[in-house]
Amino acid sequence: MLPNLLLIFFLQTPTVLDGTFSGAQAARGKALYTTHCGSCHGESLEGVSAPSLADARFIERWRESTLDGLYSFVRERMPFGRSPNSASISDREYLDIVTYMLQKNGYPAGRVEMTADSVGKVMFVGKNGPQPVPDGSLVVTIGCLSQRDGTWVVSNSTEPVRTRSETASAAEVKAAAEKRLGTLTFRLADLDAAPGFTPEMHQGHKMQVKGYLVRQPNSERINLSSIEMVSAPCVR
């Protein structure tokens, strides 16, 4: 079952199920995709020398993240091995290609085109709607640092959400101070990933944790990439 706070967040956020691009935009994207992407990813996105862009694995990789993550990846890295002499692709054309990819994955078109402003406000979700982030995702959560049976954990943690950076910015930590705590507990692994961090000095503090989520029955953990104090003591 989707946690209540996460459900409220997604109910307030447009998703790719809501018709966030137009049919005309996807049609333009199809022509651009055929020219620039089809030779590697296949005419029907089935994958040839490069991975498929229209299957469950593709959706699993990108779901529960804002769509600008996929857009930025395509814009900055594709076509792979592009020659400096090859024809340039504009940001708008990259957006069109992404909308075609969405259409081929069965997501509905709407009446309004996707723009550079809107792409970061749309959540990429699976066909069954919002779900907890998948195993192995780089995530961020906020919780209380404590020790249980000799293991460091963050308790009263928020539902983890995807993040793109392994490190925390000052703005993120400041924003975390305003966020309410949750009900989850995660074991922390790889504390040495935070040089100079001494957990004993932050026991009972509200912390922002980033790392790779490992889902295990009754014992979920986060392989740490960064940990920052939000406030002391840890209060809701």
Q: What do the predicted segments below correspond to?
A:
Residues 148-159:
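Short aromatic-glycine-enriched beta-strand elements
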Residues 48, 54-109, 162-166:
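Extracytoplasmic electron-transfer domains, predominantly the class I c-type cytochrome c fold
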Residues 212-236:
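OB-fold/S1-family single-stranded nucleic acid-binding modules
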Residues 29-43, 97, 101:
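The canonical Cys-X-X-Cys-His
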Residues 181-183, 193-209:
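Short nucleic-acid-contacting surface segments enriched for D/E, G, S/T with interspersed K/R
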Residues 12-32, 127-135:
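Electrostatic cytochrome c docking/interface patches
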Residues 143, 204-217:
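Flexible glycine-rich surface loops and low-complexity tracts that mediate binding to linear polymers
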